[in-house]
Curated annotation (Swiss-Prot):
SMART domains: YceI (SM00867)
Family: Belongs to the UPF0312 family. Type 1 subfamily.
Organism: Shigella flexneri
Taxon lineage: Bacteria, Pseudomonadati, Pseudomonadota, Gammaproteobacteria, Enterobacterales
Protein name: Protein YceI
Cell compartment(s), UniProt: Periplasm
Keyword Signal: yes
Ion transport listed as a keyword: no
Gene Ontology CC terms, in alphabetical order: periplasmic space
The gene coding this protein: yceI
Position of the signal peptide: 1-22
PANTHER family in the record: PROTEIN YCEI (PTHR34406:SF1)
Regions annotated as coiled coil: none
Keywords: Periplasm, Signal
Length: 191
């Protein structure tokens, strides 16, 4: 009887520990709960904001073990939108994103580290045919049950990339060499 009770207790502990491990989430872009935005200075006088309207992604989140976290995102670069059709056409050209040749950008995390209240998500960003490491500083906004019987987790992340690192050589002046990435995602836990 002792062995059976011990085995049952051990199995219960393993099941409980298993439910606290990493969970897989699909980014909820269909419900408009996810955004991949950017901004760049315009000639050093103002900020120009834009977004990518078409992207898909998943992430794995384990609050107790960030090293187990993973992020994978694919962006349709032709979906760039700065609220100005002529500028968007120029951004899709070979001067910038070269979407005819490189219609997708991808981000695949390689490590996640906890830094106080933030997560440093380092990964490989492939943009314009070039792959470079990029680190995003992310913060958990919230997590828990949703009204439809599911679970959700939301994050906001920021990072910077240099245009020249991704073979974008158009010179918009010294104040316009870096792009700020501003990303907000809500994920629906997969069962």
């Amino acid at each position: 009887m002792k062995k059976s009770l011990l085995g049952l207790t051990f199995a219960s502990l393993m099941f409980s520990a298993g439910s606290a491990v990493a969970a897989d989430y699909k980014i909820d872009k269909e419900g408009q709960h996810a955004f991949v935005n950017f901004r760049i200075q315009h000639l050093g006088y103002s900020w120009l904001y834009g977004t990518f309207k078409d992207f898909d992604g998943t992430f794995t989140f384990d609050e107790k073990n960030p090293a187990a976290d993973k992020v994978n995102v694919t962006i349709n670069t032709t979906s760039v939108d700065t609220n100005h059709a002529e500028r968007d056409k120029h951004l899709r050209s070979a001067d910038f994103l070269n979407t005819t040749k490189y219609p997708q950008a991808t981000f695949t995390s390689t490590s996640v580290k906890k830094d106080g209240d933030e997560l440093d998500i380092t990964g490989d960003l492939t943009l314009n045919g070039v792959t470079k490491p990029v680190t995003l500083e992310a913060k958990l906004i919230g997590q828990g049950d949703d009204p439809w019987g599911g679970k959700r987790a939301g994050f906001e992340a920021e990072g910077k990339i240099k245009l020249k690192d991704f073979n974008i050589k158009t010179d918009l002046g010294p104040a316009s060499q870096e792009v700020d990435l501003i990303i907000s995602v809500e994920g629906v836990q997969q069962k």
